[in-house]
């Protein structure tokens, strides 16, 4: 009989804060535990669940919420694949709390480490760890990791999150945690506790909004396999990484080609609605005409209703230049709802656009002009529009050569989109 477990939120938001200077995770935990606080009890419960059960635990990192499991136990890791409905050939990233834990993974027989982290990674670790950077390492013979973590690849991805709470949970659990984003596979990644499907801890919102950058320093030249919170131009300033190559494609890998890292093979980050992405610089009048034609002809609907969009809903997600609702209607905003994300508040304007004898409801969201604000609000916006049951989402893209997070944002959007438009 299948075990049934109710989703619960364990309140640990007070602990989701930067670590004080010159203070270790261990010292912080000993003080917190000695006070017998509700947050300490929640962390102990979560750690015990991770160590002894096959139930995944959602927890906040600085990027997105992760769905964590003990990376050393097959049953525990299988719980992630089951909860996310994730393909088994899509590898997982391992999260650690220290370099010492990485060394334990590289030297499964114990004793003094004989295998060290490759020197090529030292400049990156010095600059970006803890942080939103995942490195690929060789998986040793007799690996401590469950085989499901690597998807039978000879390497594994590992990172040390900058979120002090994430490292605290790993420290208390005393296990490396396999932790993909805590969402059903292919759906937008979660950036607040409310987005997480399984058992989770409410540590508040996440700061970056897109997942970690994945790099491979085992090849020559080294490569960025997935864009994320650390920009490729930042990486190129590190010794040995000046000629780092782009090793990813914004579309999913096809056929039986094995992914080198998480996030490469399958379509990701997709809401239920059809997503139409307009590349940066698209002519505004042409964009509005395209949307109008979809509304009249039903082209924006996944059902392709020949009678148009009478009574239907669409989302418009703006970044740098689009006016509200693409100026499709002079009607005043009927209603404004708020979606909170990372301490910011996203305004969702609800506007009625007349179409002959009927009308279409437009849900308009402005993410801001900076890559940082767009990254923080992107996944929350897609989820909010999903909750409104829109039929199609039209998104204003940004230039992916603007550095830092811009490439990561466009990578996620191209993976989500069914249609790319340049007009």
Identify the role of each PLM range:
Residues 1-423:
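Active-site-adjacent structural elements in enzyme catalytic cores
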């Amino acid at each position: 009989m299948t075990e049934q477990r109710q989703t619960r939120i364990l309140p640990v938001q007070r602990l989701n804060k930067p670590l004080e200077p010159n203070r270790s995770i261990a010292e912080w935990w000993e003080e917190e535990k000695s006070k017998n606080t509700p947050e300490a009890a929640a962390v102990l419960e979560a750690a015990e669940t991770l160590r002894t059960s096959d139930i995944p635990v959602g927890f906040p990192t600085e990027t997105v919420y992760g769905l964590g499991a003990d990376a050393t136990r097959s049953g525990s890791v299988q719980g992630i694949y089951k909860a996310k409905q994730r393909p088994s050939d899509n590898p997982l990233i391992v999260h650690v709390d220290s370099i010492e834990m990485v060394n334990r993974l590289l030297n499964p027989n114990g004793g003094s480490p004989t295998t060290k982290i490759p020197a090529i990674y030292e400049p990156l670790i010095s600059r970006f760890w803890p942080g939103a950077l995942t490195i690929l390492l060789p998986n040793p013979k007799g690996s401590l990791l469950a085989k499901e973590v690597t998807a039978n690849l000879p390497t594994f991805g590992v990172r040390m999150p900058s979120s002090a709470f994430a490292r605290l949970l790993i420290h208390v659990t005393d296990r490396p945690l396999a932790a993909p984003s805590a969402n059903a596979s292919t759906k937008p990644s979660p950036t607040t506790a409310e987005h997480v499907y399984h058992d989770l801890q409410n540590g508040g919102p996440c700061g970056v909004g897109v997942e970690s950058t994945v790099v491979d320093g085992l090849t020559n030249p080294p490569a960025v396999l997935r864009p994320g919170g650390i920009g490729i131009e930042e990486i190129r300033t590190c010794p040995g990484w000046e000629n780092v190559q782009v090793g990813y494609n914004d579309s999913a890998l096809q056929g039986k080609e094995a992914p080198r890292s998480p996030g490469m093979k399958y379509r990701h980050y997709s809401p239920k609605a059809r997503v139409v992405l307009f590349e940066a610089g698209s002519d505004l009048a042409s964009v509005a005409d395209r949307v109008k034609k979809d509304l009249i002809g039903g082209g924006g609907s996944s059902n392709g209703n020949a009678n148009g969009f009478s009574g239907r809903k669409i989302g418009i997600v703006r970044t740098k230049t689009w006016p509200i609702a693409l100026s499709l209607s002079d009607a005043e905003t009927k209603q404004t709802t708020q979606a909170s994300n990372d301490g910011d508040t996203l305004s969702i304007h609800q506007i009625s656009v007349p179409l002959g004898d009927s009308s279409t409801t437009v849900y308009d969201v402005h993410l801001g002009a900076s890559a940082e604000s767009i990254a923080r609000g992107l996944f929350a916006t897609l989820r909010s529009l999903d909750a409104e049951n829109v039929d199609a989402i039209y998104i204003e893209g940004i230039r992916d050569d603007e550095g830092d997070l811009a490439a990561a944002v466009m990578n996620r959007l191209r993976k989500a989109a069914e249609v790319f438009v340049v007009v």
